[in-house]
Every structure is written in structure tokens, then in C-alpha cells.
Amino acid sequence: VLGIGLSANVLGVLLGGVMAEVDDVILGRKGWREWAGYWPDAGQDMEFAGFINAVPKHVASRTLKPADMAAWQNSSLIEGDVETFVRDLKAKPGGTIAAMAGMSLVRQLLLAGLMDELTLVVHPVIAGKGRRLFEDGTPTTRLELKSNQQTSKGNMVLTYGKRAD
């Protein structure tokens, strides 16, 4: 899950080893719009730009139209239920599916049991207000820390997996 203040430093730590494994990316509407306005012209010399522009991007939205997907290469609109789409995509042979840039999308997939890992970036900032990743009433979900890395700017990149018990 990518959050505020995402710098090249954080992207490098977060995605350094993952990019080679990811075959598909799932994005929410807002995240796709933001990223579609930046990454296509970011310069292919940036490692993440080359990756995100080339990878198939599946967009979860009730308001975007299939024609909107022309704004960014390799983008397609998820038709129908996103959970069914992700289940079907997971059933196909291939690498990792990454859900990026969409808190409500990540929340939905996690609570549906469709995420095998959850990566959170903790920034050394006290915001005092803003959206919460997990709303009141979210059921308890037990996770196990799989890895943690600190960036040179003090961000913590924490990756959790499903706990076996």
C-alpha cells in the first residue's frame, strides 16, 4: 500500500525485489487517475516508471469508462465484481498480483481474504487527521510480520502475511 510522501527512496525499498515478480497491478480509480497523470511521462530511465508503464494495470471503478483506459498504456477497466475478478486472476498461472494506490480497494481485498501479503509504509509524520486504512467495525485480522526495512528518510516498510492460526 503506497501512502503519503512516497519518494523514489521509498519506492526503491518497497518495490526493488518485487517488480520482477509482479505480473499484474490492481488500482483504484483515484490512484489510477493520479498515476496516469504522472508515470507515462516520468521518464523511462526511472526503474519504477519502466515497470508501471509496461505492466498490465486493472482498474476498479464504478465511474470510469473503458475509453478512459486509453490515457495510460496497458490499462483495462475491471468489468463486474472486483473480488470475482481478483479470484479469477489469482487462479491463472503467473506471478504476483499487486494492489496499489487505493485504500478502499486494499481494504476490500484484504477483508475478502484475497491478499496474501500486506505492505504498509509508515512515515515519520503525525498527521492528526485523515482517512483511516481500517474503519470502525473492521473484523480482527491476525497478521505475521514477514519483513521490515527502514529507508534513509526514516520510513518503515513493513510486510505482513496471513497468520496460520
Residue ranges and their predicted role:
Residues 1-114, 124-165:
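Portal/gating segments that form or line small-molecule/metal binding sites
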Residues 117:
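Periplasmic plug
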